[in-house]
Amino acid sequence: QIKELVTEIAELSDKVTARFDGNNTRRPSFGVAKAGEQPRVFFAGLPMGHEFTSLILALLQVSGYAPKVSDEVLNQIKGLNLKANFDVFVSLSCHNCPDVVQALNLIAIYNPNTTATMIDGAFFQDEVEQRKIMAVPMVFQDNEHIGQGRMTLEEIVAKLDT
């Protein structure tokens, strides 16, 4: 289903290309990147339901579409002095998850030292059990739990900017 989704999206525009040569350890998964760059935004599982908007926004923002956040917050994201991989575990029926996924995607898009991966817990039950995830969204930075539940972009950036 993921290959089908990615192929369909690529067929909608000549500005989108689908490649199937990734080496992400989580399968099924895919990354989103500007042409010529390595992906920093990843989706592990099928981003449907509430997460479909997260995928569309990632495609738009990677291509240069300006996000609806202040210049101050964007500059703060660009200035974050960190190298990090963020994982956010979600459920496709979760109402709070897209805001957190979209915030972390934006951080990965605007700060080249970061990556963000949305992980659909339904696809990765072993990892959910191993990390003892009982509620979503649950966020990890370099495999260390840093937050869960509803969080705004500004709250996440403030937490990272300490």
Describe the predicted segments one by one:
Residues 1-32:
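Oxidative protein folding and maturation machinery
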Residues 93-96, 131, 158-161:
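Terminal low-complexity, intrinsically disordered regions
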